[in-house]
Amino acid sequence: MNTLKDNFYQDWRVFDIIHWGENLLLSNGFNDAKQEIEWMLCDLLKFKRSDIYANIGERISKSNVTDLKEWINQRIKNKPVQYITGKTEFYGHEISVSPHVLIPRPETERLVDVAIDTIKNLSNPKVLEVGTGSGCISIAIGSAKKDANILSLDISAAALKVAKMNTKKNNISNVKFEKLDFLRSIPKGEYDLVISNPPYISKYEIKKIMLDVRKYEPEIALTDNNDGLKFYRRFCDNVKKLIKKRGSLILEVGIGSHPMRAFEIFYSSGFKKIELIPDYNGDLRVLKIEI
């Protein structure tokens, strides 16, 4: 394995560090090496992607080189780039992330699309999110639907701290947070929309997922330590207490057989207005139930 002691340059240009970093990451098995080194470099130098090649011959300060080398070293140890830089983008918003919260995924933007479309014609809709994490879902909905009143729940105080920071950073004022264990209790009130990206990886599958996910992302946000359906049963049992008549429940689902297994939980309980919605790759990733 190559290490950061190899190929130490005394004088670095943008080109040099892209070339060196890309080769180092490639040699350590990272297939998206160029994209990742550009991502880190943009964050470090406060560049937009287009700025990189407009400044390809510019020299980089010694302190920035030192920082970037440390970041690459962390990446070689499989730490996700988003945790290294401390942020990512979701639905056009910059979202701070830490190992206390799940890294927002592009496929979850489809969940937000469906939610916004569902409540777009409602006045002052009440929205409940279960599983705040970084707050990205509530922030995206709250930004798009400014008259919505959103309550976002999480069992983790550390996650809620990150989410509150993100709402402040994105100037979102219509989201409130509450610490609550949804598997043990439910919030008061009725909502026009309940939305969640719950832990849906089973205790068997969690052992097989990518190392950078398994090693660094919070297990509580990934798996229910059961069959991956515990939260869906909990929603099914309580949905009529939580949602107004003609309201909706929107849930992200996993891959493989998981979407149909989640669908069956609600169908076998008598719910008829159920829809599985594909993401932009054509995979069924959103489950919508109308009450």
Region roles according to the model:
Residues N2-L4, F8-I60, N64, L68:
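A short N-terminal interaction module
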Residues C42-D117:
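Conserved AdoMet
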Residues E94, N149, N174-K176, K272-E275:
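Conserved beta-strand segments of alpha/beta enzyme cores
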Residues Y200-F231:
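Mobile active-site "lid"/loop adjacent to the S-adenosyl-L-methionine
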